[in-house]
């Protein structure tokens, strides 16, 4: 904690501050004759022109904040903060409102967990903007950039930020009732004792704004011995800005989104069914797949948007087989004679499917390998024979290559080959276990899922800390575009938007309340 601000400055020093037109307000103290209720102290974080303040009304348990500051964003923050030092698992909940609709539409009122009072501190917050936009913001390293996951709920009545172990998540309520999980479950490294509180930034250094926080609840949650409650969140991430947008969250397990060819809806699987829902959000609708009622997470639309490839386990001793159905639903048509078979890619001309299959189970050489088969029917062609697991085959948009992942070198890495299986070559060479390469519509980028090396190369489990990484096809230098709690079912199948600007994926969370 920084020292108290000196109230009376020498004239020369004061003149310097006035000339600069800015005040570094680090006044960490409670008001002289009032309580801050649940919190211990208040003050401005970062550089502000106009000092903020807080008034606490004990009779209504309401905090009225005034605050200035450029923003809570990028690499440094400037805002009014009211806090308490805590550690461990935390839940902070409040109703938040702005008294006026004027000012910057992106003024922010926040519920925050923060490592320190430095402007560039590690933090996570749930922020509601003046225009109603709501997001889980986070900076996971000191001096790093702020990132966010935008909620699909605008102007929620009640907001919550919660920390469980190393993870944080947001919960929101549109009207009366308790907030429900709305996405997040991010690993944010808060060490030891950290700051928990409420804050306000005007998003305009020359303006002072106001916000009200009522029905504030702050609890230190003891670890629960009960079974976790599992949630899945359908999200999209912009590959350029890495901003994330929540499409749908539910207290259930669903997986593996595809983008429709026209960009209007997303396809995913849940409880043996394949569903679709608008990209803008809404209620998922089941796609009729007839007798195929045990569909897994390997599915995707044809290039001409008339058919949907599915992988289903309802026949032949529940081994997976590949089928096609009309994109709007209908009777499945069987494509693969042999099982288990798991679809992964369409050829650009829509005439061939790439899939993963295991043959001669229990015998030598029964590894999962890459196969192709004509959509119109015919014999399958085996393309890989290397020892170990091969998975995730997907055609490049120009039809020149099939990209896939293979553990043949001892770790799971991305490979590619010609569509006849020739010229197999390794693409990634790093310490991660890399799965499910997906090529951008223009053929310039690869996105894939990376597990840390504490996971077996041949395994891709659920509920792990994983990275979604983006890599140019020509330079092969990858960067992280999303830190995700997920794994199996996150991006198993092609998930680029048709315009190549976003990736759809599923993240998971598990809470014990």
Put a short name on every predicted segment.
Residues 1-13:
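Bacterial N-terminal signal peptides that target proteins for export
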Residues 4, 64, 102-103, 169, ...:
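Short amphipathic alpha-helical segments with coiled-coil-like heptad repeat character
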Residues 5-8, 117, 142, 166, ...:
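Sequence-pattern detector for short linear motifs
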Residues 10-23:
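Bacterial N-terminal signal peptides
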Residues 28-225:
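Extracellular glycan-recognition regions
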């Amino acid at each position: 904690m920084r020292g108290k601000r000196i109230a009376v400055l020498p004239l020369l020093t004061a003149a310097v501050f006035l000339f600069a037109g800015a005040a570094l307000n680090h006044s960490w103290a409670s008001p002289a004759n009032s309580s801050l209720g649940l919190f211990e102290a208040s003050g401005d974080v970062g550089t502000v022109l106009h000092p903020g303040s807080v008034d606490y009304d004990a009779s209504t348990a309401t905090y009225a904040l005034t605050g200035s500051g450029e923003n809570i964003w990028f690499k440094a923050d400037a805002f009014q903060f009211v806090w308490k030092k805590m550690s461990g698992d935390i839940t902070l909940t409040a109703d938040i409102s702005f008294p006026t609709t004027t000012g910057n539409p992106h003024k922010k009122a926040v519920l925050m967990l923060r490592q320190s009072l430095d402007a560039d501190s590690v933090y996570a917050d749930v922020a509601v903007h003046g225009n109603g936009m709501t997001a889980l913001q986070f900076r996971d390293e000191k001096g790093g950039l702020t990132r966010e996951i935008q909620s699909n709920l605008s102007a929620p009545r009640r907001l919550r930020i919660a920390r469980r172990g190393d993870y944080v998540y947001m919960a929101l309520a549109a009207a009366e009732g308790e907030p429900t999980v709305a996405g997040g479950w991010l690993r944010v490294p808060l060490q030891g004792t950290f700051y928990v509180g409420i804050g306000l930034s005007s998003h305009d250094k020359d303006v002072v704004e106001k916000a009200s926080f009522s029905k504030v609840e702050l609890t230190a949650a003891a670890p629960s011995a009960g079974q976790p409650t599992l949630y899945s969140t359908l999200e999209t991430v912009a590959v350029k800005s890495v901003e994330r947008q929540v499409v749908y969250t539910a207290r259930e397990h669903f997986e593996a989104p595809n983008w429709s060819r026209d960009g209007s809806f997303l396809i995913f699987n849940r409880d043996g069914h394949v569903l679709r829902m608008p990209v803008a959000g809404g209620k998922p609708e089941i796609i009729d797949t007839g007798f195929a009622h045990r569909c897994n997470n390997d599915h995707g639309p044809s290039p001409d948007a008339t058919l949907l490839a599915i992988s289903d386990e309802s026949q032949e001793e529940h081994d997976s087989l590949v089928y096609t159905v009309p994109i709007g639903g209908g009777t499945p048509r069987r494509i693969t004679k042999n099982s288990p078979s798991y679809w992964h890619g369409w050829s650009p001309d829509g005439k061939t499917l790439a899939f993963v299959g295991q043959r001669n189970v229990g015998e030598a050489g029964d590894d999962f390998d890459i196969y192709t088969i004509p959509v119109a029917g015919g014999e399958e062609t085996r393309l890989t024979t290397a020892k170990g697991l091969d998975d995730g085959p997907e055609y490049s948009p120009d039809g020149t290559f099939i990209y896939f992942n293979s553990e043949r070198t001892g770790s799971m890495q991305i490979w590619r080959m010609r569509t006849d299986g020739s010229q197999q070559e390794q693409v990634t060479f790093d310490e991660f276990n890399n799965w499910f390469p997906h090529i951008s519509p223009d053929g310039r980028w690869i996105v894939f899922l990376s597990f840390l090396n504490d996971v077996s190369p041949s395994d891709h489990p659920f509920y792990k800390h994983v990275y979604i990484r983006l890599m140019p096809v020509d330079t092969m230098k990858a960067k992280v575009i999303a830190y995700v709690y997920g794994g199996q079912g996150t991006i198993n199948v092609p998930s680029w938007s048709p315009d190549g600007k976003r990736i759809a994926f599923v993240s998971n969370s598990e809470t014990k309340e």
